[in-house]
A protein has these predicted regions:
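Nucleotide/phosphate-binding catalytic cleft detector across ATP-hydrolyzing
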Residues: 1-89, 94, 106, 140-148, ...
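Extended, hydrophobic alpha-helical segments in both membrane/secreted and soluble proteins
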Residues: 95-99, 109, 151
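Short glycine-rich, Thr/Ser-proximal phosphate-binding strand/loop in the N-terminal lobe
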Residues: 101-141
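N-terminal catalytic scaffold of extracellular/periplasmic and nuclease hydrolases
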Residues: 133, 149-153
Length: 173
């Protein structure tokens, strides 16, 4: 079974006039040589390749997220950052939300934070909240904003406690 995400350090060859291969193609070839055959590279990541590859001397780390049939490259970083491989595990309860920062290589929980689910302001149980959202279209937005506010608060707490920004977590489970 493949993991949810992987960080792969690549030491790419410098481009030459004799082998005019794009940075994207060089990355794809290096990943294919390691067994990652179907990698989707979105435009947002492609835009980062130049000048990052050159500034890093073509020593880069790519973060891949496994999808059903392929991998998606979600980040590219200078140097070897493979030891900084994190994910978020969330227990989204009706009254309490618990969020853990997990080291994806060791499986260790680095930190755990929890908060009252912000949706409880709109009903103490799920059925009350469903009824509330059906009363008016703007109520759905209020419930959604309460959820986002709670999640953002927990992400900030994790970053403050550990010094690890949630942006370094390619996966939330």
């Amino acid at each position: 079974m493949k993991r949810f995400s992987e960080k792969v350090f690549l030491q790419l060859k410098m481009p030459t006039e004799e082998v005019p291969v794009s940075d994207e193609k060089r990355i794809r070839l290096a990943l294919e040589a390691l067994g990652y055959e179907h990698v989707n590279i979105p435009l947002s990541v492609m835009r980062q390749l130049y000048p990052l590859c050159r500034n890093a001397g073509f020593d880069i780390t790519v973060t891949l997220v496994h999808r059903e049939t392929d991998w998606a490259m979600v980040r590219v970083e200078a140097g070897d950052t493979t030891k900084e491989h994190y994910a978020l595990a969330v227990d989204y309860g009706s009254t309490t939300i618990v969020m853990e920062l997990v080291d994806m290589d060791s499986g260790a929980v680095i930190d755990r934070v929890k908060s009252v689910n912000g949706q409880t302001a709109y009903g103490t149980d799920i059925l009350s909240r469903i009824t509330y959202t059906m009363e008016a279209p703007e109520h759905r937005e209020q419930i959604q904003k309460a959820t986002v506010k709670t999640f953002n608060s927990l992400l900030v707490q994790l970053a403050e406690n550990t010094g690890i920004d949630a942006a370094k977590c390619p996966v939330m489970i």
